[in-house]
């Protein structure tokens, strides 16, 4: 078993060359330029105003969030890069670097060379990310993890994005009560669990469970709210977007620890550009072997889930019935997504056996 793990690590290290484009000096791109304190953002009369349609300001939400919650993450690992929240700025970094925040309609230059910090309100990817940035940030402020409780936070909402946006904690809670409550629950869990006497293993499992519950509901909310924006993209990009959402269900159920290093490894082989008509993995000439493989596997996972009416995802969730099962699930996903030599049939047979084991435990 140890030999297999060592080989797997060596294979993963080989992906760093591709993944490096998401980072600068080991941190997400734009991280060093993004404001690191609430007081660094524009404010007047004790009201901080955030423009989440600017890449630097949206990245600042994550920088402030990661910094403010780090003291509660000791159970995650021995350094400050182990927090699962690192996965969120890495997602944003990939979307920026791959051109997925650019106006897909071509009607404006938003996100292009002349206006690189602009996040287009027409971008499906930007819309989805909104629910993974603004909502968690406002929830953290409300729960007292960010700020001193005296400064209010306002969020800019462009007229063309008014329906998909909200301007404050009160406004966002009214529009998305269940989602805001789920993220508040995560931050409360973070505070409570970090102060408890349970083992670090148990703390980690509870924190990751609450984190992925928040991220899953954010994605589900975004799926319906952002759906119309998919019409701006090619059919291969739409198919990839749907498969990306489907893959998130597997990652969430396994309680993936989206630390800085883990997130870079898993996001490095995501496609480095928006897909166009005619792109068909695993034979897209200007994408790397790893990118082609990831696109192919994501597509296969989504096709199987569609053909079998959602039963593969349900089966996967059933198989993630214990902390040990989730640990095995994380390793299985790692092999499937990152190792081109790992057979799909092997994945299916192992998953089937894991499901049987869980069924046996529950009877």
From Swiss-Prot:
Record keyword Thylakoid present: no
Subcellular location: Secreted
A matching Pfam family: Leg1
Keyword Glycoprotein found: yes
Chain segments annotated as transmembrane: none
Coiled-coil parts of chain: none
Predominant subcellular localization, coarse grouping: secreted
Signal peptide boundaries: 1-19
Positions annotated as glycosylated: 79, 261, 292
InterPro entries from the UniProt entry: Leg1
GO CC annotation: extracellular space
Keywords on record: Developmental protein, Glycoprotein, Secreted, Signal
Chain's role: May be involved in early liver development.
Entry's family note: Belongs to the LEG1 family.
Family matches, as PANTHER family: LEG1 (PTHR18820), PROTEIN LEG1 HOMOLOG (PTHR18820:SF1)
Name of this protein: Protein LEG1 homolog
Gene name in the database record: leg1
